[in-house]
Amino acid sequence: MTLRSVCVFCGASPGASPVYQEAAVALGRHLAERGLTLVYGGGAVGLMGTVADAALAAGGEVIGIIPQSLQEAEIGHKGLTRLEVVDGMHARKARMAELADAFIALPGGLGTLEELFEVWTWGQLGYHAKPLGLLEVNGFYDPLLTFLDHLVDERFVRAEHRGMLQRGASPEALLDALAAWTPSVAPKWVDRTPQ
C-alpha cells in the first residue's frame, strides 16, 4: 500500500514521562523524512503540538483539523501548513479519516482511544481499508493489548479484526508494517452459533 498521509492520534497532554514527547518527536520527524503528510487534531499543546512541531521542523507538511470550540479556546496550532476549522468532534474525525491513508496512535487519553476505536470500527465494518497501528512507547498500550486479546478469547472480537491493529517499537518499524498491510476479509461479526 502506498502511503501519502498518516493521521496521528495522541494526547493533548505531554504525559508523565519525557519518553512520550521523545516518541512524538521521532514520529513527526520520521513522517517528514519519508515525505508523508501528517494529519492530526490541530492542537498546539501536549503530544499533539510536539508531533506537529517535529514534522514541521523536519520540513514536513502538517494538516490540522480542529473543532471551532477548541479553536476559540486558542489551542489551535498557528504554524501549520493548513489548519481546517470544523463544526465539531464528529466532523473532525471524519475529515481526518478522509485525508489519511493510515492511522497511528501515540499515547493519549480518552480522546485518543475514542479516535482509534472509531476508525478501527469503521475498518471492521468495511467503511475503509486503511491500516492502523500503535507506536509502542514505554509499554503504554500493553494493558490495552491484553484486554483486546481477552475480547478475542471471549468471542466478542474476531481474531481477524484484532489483527487489523498493527504495532511497532519505532516509527520506522510501524510505518513499514502499515505500508505492507493488506486488508483481510472476515465476516463482520463473531460466529453466533450457541456453545
Curated annotation (Swiss-Prot):
Signal sequence bounds: none
EC number: 3.2.2.n1, 3.2.2.4
Known outcome of mutating T112A: Almost complete loss of activity
Gene3D superfamilies for the chain: 3.40.50.450
SUPFAM superfamilies noted in UniProt: MCP/YpsA-like
UniProt similarity note: Belongs to the LOG family.
Protein name: Cytokinin riboside 5'-monophosphate phosphoribohydrolase
Species for this entry: Pseudomonas aeruginosa (strain ATCC 15692 / DSM 22644 / CIP 104116 / JCM 14847 / LMG 12228 / 1C / PRS 101 / PAO1)
